[in-house]
Amino acid sequence: MGMILTGRRVGAVEGQQLGFVNEVTPVGQSVEGARRWAAQILECSPMSIRASKQAVMDGLEAGGALAAMKAQGGFAAVRAMSRSEDFIEGPKAFAEKRPPVWKGR
């Protein structure tokens, strides 16, 4: 809250300590850092990524996640994900100790 009220700027390391910077890379290695993050995201179900993004964006627009859920009767992308093949594939792959094969449906 203090940063919002004062407009105080912070560097990358402090931003990471505060939790709004994911990774601080040495000079010249930001592309490699971004690729590491992209690779981790790509390991996830496309439907779960879509649902997560929808929840965050709708929550910002509605003044909070709870307000957005109430306004929409829940998040459409979350409902779709919970009825998807990917919803079954994640726990199944975990139980079988193998990487999941996401279908995006």
Language-model regions: role of each:
Residues 1-8:
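Short helix- or helix-capping micro-motifs
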Residues 3, 55, 59, 76-82:
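Helix-loop "lid/cap" segments that line or gate small-molecule binding pockets
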Residues 8-14:
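Short, glycine/polar-rich helix-capping loops at beta-to-alpha or helix-loop-helix junctions
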Residues 12, 21-69, 102-105:
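C-terminal long alpha-helix characteristic of the crotonase
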Residues 15, 52, 94:
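Terminal peptide-recognition signature
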Residues 18-19, 97:
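Structural motif
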Residues 83-87, 93:
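Interdomain hinge/lid region at the active-site interface
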Residues 92-105:
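Terminal low-complexity tails and localization/encapsulation signals of metabolic enzymes
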